[in-house]
Amino acid sequence: MDPILVLVLTLSCLFLLSLWRQSSERGKLPPGPTPLPIIGNILQIDVKDICQSFTNLSKVYGPVYTLYLGRKPTVVLHGYEAVKEALVDHGEEFAGRGRFPVFDKATNGMGLAFSKGNVWKNTRRFSLMTLRNLGMGKRSIEDRVQEEARCLVEELRKTNGSPCDPTFILGCAPCNVICSIIFQDRFDYKDRDFLNLMEKLNEITKILSSPWLQICNTYPALLDYCPGSHKQFFKNYASIKNFLLEKIKEHEESLDVTIPRDFIDYFLINGGQEDGNQPLQNRLEHLAITVTDLFSAGTETTSTTLRYAILLLLKYPHVTAKVQEEIEHVIGKHRSPCMQDRSRMPYTDAMIHEVQRFIDLIPNSLPHEVTSDIKFRNYFIPKGTTVITSLSSVLHDSTEFPNPEKFDPGHFLDENGKFKKSDYFIPFSTGKRICAGEGLARMELFLFLTSILQNFNLKPLVHPKDIDVTPMLIGLASVPPAFQLCFIPS
């Protein structure tokens, strides 16, 4: 038989088999657009704005639908009811971590953020317990944040009211807080090694939010066989991990098991007990990736939110004026802000909540995975299926937040000007995979922003109406555009 004919017949059979398999799977899964063989539904997704693509598809297929990202089915949950029903009402079944190829390759299933099963359960339980032991939720951690807020204010004073890019200054403060928790140390804001780390973290966020990385996560083979920005991601990730491995080595040499100093000490003393059969090198690798997760998440998410908050306050000076008026009335000029002040500052609290809602920092959270076969809303979702939860669809729900595309602290105020909670406020996600550092992040945002506005007036370099607050990238994170401003001492 003609070899070309054999090849054509073989490819045709593979094509039909692929169609049959996808059709068979789709009969069980929620509805969705018909996928093409091999490439799935990638042509129906705008990799520059995945959130809008998800919203458009939800209007056709409803709040629970199936997409094929490559050849793998992925269930998308859109809207508050679907997200809550899955992550809260069926929390155990949706507590797995879905495929995230770039991180799967970098972490090898270790650490806190991207591990699964018992590895994740043990690591999360240990991490939460240790963070509490180190003062999370207590006065001691507030003291650390207040001290760093004072350092931040002093660093901003050194700009002498001149135009500056706030990216790294605002990143140093939350980074120093998490460094003090992980390895009991902080850095000077001008330390070259420190700024190098900050630069690598900032670059990682941009790379992860780029269209190219969205494509790589859909077609993981590209990570191994194609050039691209993912190579720089792996290089930066390895640099940060190696920096932390050096800190771990220093801790091993100075460890006193009777007096644990920080997160690394607690892990070296207790953290490997449940994995006692694991080789020492694997346990140290797991520790390194765990603290890399804490270091990265504890720095970049808060610093990006702070940066976006400053940009929005420049854009809306009437909001800034109201916050500063409240700061003057409640705190004054002669003491540092503290967390007790928050309950007496409803407008400031509402402003910070509105920043987090409006910027939609991690629009689709991290991917989940169902840990067992489950019947969900009359659909069958098999074990191992990746699930994407659209936090953006919840934070921008027009029934809960009128004019959701408008920045308005009134979304979190009642008719009497009191702070109003909302179940739809889930920037840290919800359920069993909710961000472990939520409490610390909320404390940092309040204390850092109030300290800045207590001591400085924010002066933009252009008229507020000309300030663009549109994200420069929307992928894993919503990345704000670059900007400069002047911090004028008040």
From Swiss-Prot:
EC number assigned by the record: 1.14.14.1
Residues reported to bind heme: 435
Localization, per the record, is: Endoplasmic reticulum membrane; Microsome membrane
* Residues recorded with modification Phosphoserine: 127
Q: Quote the function comment for this protein.
A: A cytochrome P450 monooxygenase that metabolizes (5Z,8Z,11Z,14Z)-eicosatetraenoic acid (arachidonate) to primarily produce 12-hydroxyeicosatetraenoic acid (12-HETE). Mechanistically, uses molecular oxygen inserting one oxygen atom into a substrate, and reducing the second into a water molecule, with two electrons provided by NADPH via cytochrome P450 reductase (CPR; NADPH--hemoprotein reductase).
Write out the catalysed reaction.
an organic molecule + reduced [NADPH--hemoprotein reductase] + O2 = an alcohol + oxidized [NADPH--hemoprotein reductase] + H2O + H(+); (5Z,8Z,11Z,14Z)-eicosatetraenoate + reduced [NADPH--hemoprotein reductase] + O2 = 12-hydroxy-(5Z,8Z,10E,14Z)-eicosatetraenoate + oxidized [NADPH--hemoprotein reductase] + H2O + H(+)
Q: How does it sit in the membrane?
A: Peripheral membrane protein
Q: Which residues carry this modification: N6-acetyllysine?
A: 249, 375
- Name of encoding gene: Cyp2c37
Q: In which tissues is it expressed?
A: Liver.
- Per the record, the domain of life is Eukaryota
* PANTHER family, per database record: CYTOCHROME P450 2C29-RELATED (PTHR24300:SF384), CYTOCHROME P450 508A4-RELATED (PTHR24300)
Give any single GO term for biological process: arachidonate metabolic process
List the signal peptide residues. 1-20
Q: Which UniProt keywords apply?
A: Acetylation, Endoplasmic reticulum, Heme, Iron, Lipid metabolism, Membrane, Metal-binding, Microsome, Monooxygenase, Oxidoreductase, Phosphoprotein, Signal
Q: Which family does it belong to?
A: Belongs to the cytochrome P450 family.
Give yes or no: UniProt keyword Phosphoprotein. Answer: yes
Q: Which CDD domains match?
A: CYP2C-like
Instruction: State the name under which the record lists this protein.
Output: Cytochrome P450 2C37
Sorted alphabetically, the Gene Ontology cellular component annotations on this record are: endoplasmic reticulum membrane
Record's InterPro entries? Cyt_P450 (IPR001128), Cyt_P450_CS (IPR017972), Cyt_P450_E_grp-I (IPR002401), Cyt_P450_sf (IPR036396), Cytochrome_P450_fam2 (IPR050182)
A Gene Ontology MF term for this entry?
iron ion binding
Q: What class of enzyme is it?
A: oxidoreductase
Tell me the pathway: Lipid metabolism; arachidonate metabolism
